[in-house]
Amino acid sequence: MRNIHATAVIGSGAVLGEGVEIGPYTVIEDDVVIGDRTVIGPHVHIADGARIGNECRISTGAVLATAPQDLKYAGEKTYLHIGDRTVIRECVTLNRGTKASGKTVVGSDNLIMAYVHAGHDCVIGNHVVIANSVQFGGHCHVGDYVVVGGLAGVHQXVRIGRYAMVGGISRAALDVPPFVMAGGHASFRYEGLNVIGLKRRGFTSEQLGNIRDAYRIIFQSGLLLSKALEAVRNDLPQTPEVVEILDFFASGVYNRKFLKPFNS
């Protein structure tokens, strides 16, 4: 059974799952799909193109699937996809995509805290925690189990690898490879492995050692990046974690530069 407040405005074409709750003065446009048992608070605006999964929680003042903030956008049909069990807190804004990819994607089991903005064509993975007032430019890619500290600004097209942690108030204008900590405003730098986060997620001492060995070569050997990656490829066991690190450095799309070592 759905519970929809009398003051909510629901488009005639909107598809609402079983057990959906919608608070007062919320506006849901026509081309919207909302999964079962999702709870939407008061004064929320969900625009055409939103595809929201099951058991999400969307708080007061959130604005989802509005048009991308991109001068090239010409009104083409695009989407915002949100997975299951994602929590979206107060006044979050998530724009839909542009013709570049057609959609902005937010995965499942995420916590997106108040006043976060994610621009057009962003891809945010699963089990991600984004603290208050983080701002993502368009085309950012955020891997699974990433944590981003409050008030960080993430430049358009930046990639953040899985299990990485970005410190609060950072100016993240460089790609952040998996498993590391990064931070800084005037100088955004590598700050070591995300050891506590990795241990909490069940990484073994052997896995941590393999990751540490790879990043010692990449960030502390003094080698050019291309030579450091070659050394990692040739001199270390090619475990899944090491391969993931190498793949990240090999797969940049927008030619963003990579994170620098803390002593550079």
UniProtKB/Swiss-Prot annotation:
Principal localisation: cytoplasm
Subcellular location: Cytoplasm
Keywords: Acyltransferase, Cytoplasm, Lipid A biosynthesis, Lipid biosynthesis, Lipid metabolism, Repeat, Transferase
InterPro entries per UniProt: Acetyltransf_C (IPR029098), Acetyltransf_C_sf (IPR037157), Hexapep (IPR001451), Lipid_A_LpxA (IPR010137), Trimer_LpxA-like_sf (IPR011004)
Function (record text): Involved in the biosynthesis of lipid A, a phosphorylated glycolipid that anchors the lipopolysaccharide to the outer membrane of the cell.
Family statement drawn from the similarity comment of this UniProt entry: Belongs to the transferase hexapeptide repeat family. LpxA subfamily.
Protein name in the entry: Acyl-[acyl-carrier-protein]--UDP-N-acetylglucosamine O-acyltransferase
Species, as recorded: Chlorobaculum tepidum (strain ATCC 49652 / DSM 12025 / NBRC 103806 / TLS) (Chlorobium tepidum)
Lineage per the UniProt record: Bacteria, Pseudomonadati, Chlorobiota, Chlorobiia, Chlorobiales
Gene this protein is translated from: lpxA
